[in-house]
Amino acid sequence: MEIGTARLSEDLLAQFPHHLIGIREVPEIFSVGDFCTLARFHINETLKRERIPLLVGGTMFYFSALLRGIPNLPAADPALRERLAHEVRQSGLDTLYRRLQKMDPVSANRIDPNDRQRILRAVEINILSGKQVSECEHSDGLDKTGVNVSRISLSVSDRRTLHRRIDDRLRQMIDAGLVDEVRGIRSRYPQSRGMPAMKSVGYQQVWSHLENEVDEGQMIADIATATRRLAKRQLTWLRHERGVTWFDASSQGLVSSVSRYLNAADISIMGH
């Protein structure tokens, strides 16, 4: 998975070493617990070398778990899960999602309305624990270790500019061979459509196209819509985060502004 994830080129990866890229195959599960364990290992190794780890990415749930710890959640209940799945089959996923919005609006706001697996799990947690997911006790995260984690985020103030950039990036991915990339994955792992990796924006829409469920034009429109929704959820999440320093992504002096901020700050770990 390279084109749809905007993976850096091998030259850039050689010039700027990254961790946790390309470490799993498509059918393999990579849980938030797996991520936190590996991320903390590489963070500690980087700090031992007296360097500042830079955490870069867009998966806010994983970043939050790394900072605050992983919620101590109740184990899955197969009988309850099947009951909820039956409800979805009978009434549709949107009905269960609306139920989640009433039970746990914070979690609902963070979950894609089409993400069946996460919606089922969130409702299950609320029922089993009697609490919202955010109210469950957390294991220790980086925020409790004494390190200074500085958070920065980039914003695009004009929504039209943001949507234009999304459309431009989508066209670049299509031109770079996104459809062929998914076709290759589908050929190697024909049973992987339901895996978390294939639910990523872009991959699931292309898979639908390859199954002749939608034509190319609809596929492109669906990817654009899903990407805009994802961007909106990410911005909503970040706006509720405490201690985030914002920079205008359209600013001509963006690089120098961020550099000045980094040089002036007392930072142990940098999150972006």
Residue ranges and their predicted role:
Residues 1-272:
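Phosphate/pyrophosphate-binding catalytic cores of soluble transferases and nucleic-acid-acting enzymes
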